[in-house]
């Protein structure tokens, strides 16, 4: 008999962890196994249909929250339950570490590859570990961890149903880049490549969704060989992305900052794009934004490193194979890759000049993601991996 599952992080539709929790909960509800939510779900950040399905879980959440409040800082052991804990780099748990079950499973997508004795000790307290990339699983195997579960994240095909282009960007060749600004995401590489590409193709337009809910974490991008400084933080607490792009030689008429995109906006924006670029230095999972672009039928350029390798198939994207090592003085960046600006420019030019080949690539990518990388498939394999 299956144990009850307890999700200890916040469900939402605004970031990866929230989506992992939400789609796991929806799957469990379909299996008539409602999960216990230890954290209050962010219902305001859910589409109405999903909100309606999650709301009935609030009653049990409020009961466990009241018990937790009465217990103060004590460990809460939930007998007969499997507790899933979301872990950060270094296997650092959040406040939910106080919830433990008959089985406690650690869920992680990590980019920091340094494993000292303290990290290994924290990892060993879990009855099982589940990751979201072959890259992470292999790194754990090197450290002696066996039986690590693997579940690939995905997309919701209904949410990303094909929509016709609106023509909002006119006759421009539109390049999309998404993901919060930080060193490992490689927005500096995007700017360097786009600046050169636009010199060849003056009708090119870079459309970005780079805002970072934790703007101070963007400071590390100053380590880049392509940029002298990170974007400034404005008085409103948001990154001054347009100014940063201008400082890198991208003219105002070739750059649009879309701000923070809502889930309902993604498909419509991507319908007007001709390419999506992801020269990321590292992905602990498989890059949700890249999969969304593929699902919407946009030809995608992907760095061939870390978690991206689980997305790359023959013909379904244009991989950036020229990968150089990223400086790694302390062993925290094993497997990270520095993409070639020149190769990225070449791939963009190929998509520009051969639209038929671009369409074939887009269709291969769309078929792959919609067939093999859905949230439904993720949730099924995730629950199996947990149990």
Residue ranges and their predicted role:
Residues 117-118, 155-172:
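Acidic anion/phosphate-binding donor-loop and adjacent secondary structure
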Residues 6, 168-185, 191-198, 206-210:
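Conserved donor-binding/catalytic core segment of Leloir-type glycosyltransferases
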Residues 6-8, 47-141:
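Extended catalytic core of nucleotide-activated donor transferases of GT-like folds
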Residues 219-264:
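Nucleotide-activated donor-binding/catalytic signature segment of Leloir-type glycosyltransferases, i.e.
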Residues 127-138, 145-162:
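Donor nucleotide-sugar binding/catalytic pocket of nucleotide-sugar-dependent glycosyltransferases
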Residues 339, 343-344, 352-384:
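A charged, aromatic-enriched C-terminal amphipathic alpha-helix characteristic of glycosyltransferases
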Residues 299-302, 316-319:
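Short hydrophobic beta-strand element within catalytic cores of glycosyltransferases
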Residues 268-285, 298:
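Acidic donor-binding loop of glycosyltransferase active sites
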């Amino acid at each position: 008999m299956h144990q009850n599952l307890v999700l200890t992080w916040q469900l939402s539709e605004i970031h990866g962890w929230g989506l992992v929790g939400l789609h796991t909960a929806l799957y469990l509800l379909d299996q008539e196994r409602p999960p216990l939510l230890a954290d209050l779900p962010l219902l305001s950040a859910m589409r109405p249909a999903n909100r309606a399905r999650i709301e009935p879980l609030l009653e049990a959440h409020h009961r466990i929250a009241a018990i937790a409040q009465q217990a103060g800082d004590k460990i809460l052991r939930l007998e007969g339950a499997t507790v899933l804990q979301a872990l950060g780099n270094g296997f650092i748990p959040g406040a939910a570490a106080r919830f433990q079950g008959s089985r406690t499973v650690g869920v992680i997508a990590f980019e920091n590859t340094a494993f000292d004795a303290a990290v290994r000790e924290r990892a060993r307290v879990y009855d099982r570990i589940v990751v979201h990339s072959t890259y992470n699983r292999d790194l754990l195997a090197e450290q002696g961890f066996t039986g690590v579960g693997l579940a690939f994240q995905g997309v919701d095909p209904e949410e990303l149903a094909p929509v016709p282009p609106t023509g909002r960007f006119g006759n421009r060749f539109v390049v999309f880049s998404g993901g919060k600004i930080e060193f490992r995401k490689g927005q500096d590489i995007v700017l360097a490549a786009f600046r050169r590409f636009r010199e060849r193709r003056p009708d090119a337009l870079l459309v970005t969704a780079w805002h970072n809910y934790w703007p101070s974490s963007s400071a590390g991008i100053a380590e880049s060989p392509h940029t002298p400084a990170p974007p400034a933080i404005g008085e409103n607490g948001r990154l001054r992305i347009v100014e940063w792009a201008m400082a890198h030689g991208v003219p105002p008429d070739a750059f649009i900052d879309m701000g923070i995109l809502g889930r309902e906006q993604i498909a419509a924006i991507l319908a007007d794009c001709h390419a999506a670029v992801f020269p990321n230095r590292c992905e602990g999972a498989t890059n949700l934004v890249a999969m969304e672009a593929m699902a919407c039928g946009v030809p995608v350029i992907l760095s061939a490193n870390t978690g991206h390798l689980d997305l790359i198939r023959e013909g379904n994207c244009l991989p950036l194979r020229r990968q150089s090592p990223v400086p790694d003085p302390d062993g925290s960046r094993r497997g990270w890759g520095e993409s070639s600006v020149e190769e990225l420019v070449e791939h963009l030019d190929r998509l520009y000049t051969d639209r038929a080949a671009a369409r074939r690539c887009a269709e291969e990518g769309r078929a792959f993601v919609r067939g093999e990388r859905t949230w439904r498939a993720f949730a099924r394999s995730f629950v199996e991996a947990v149990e």
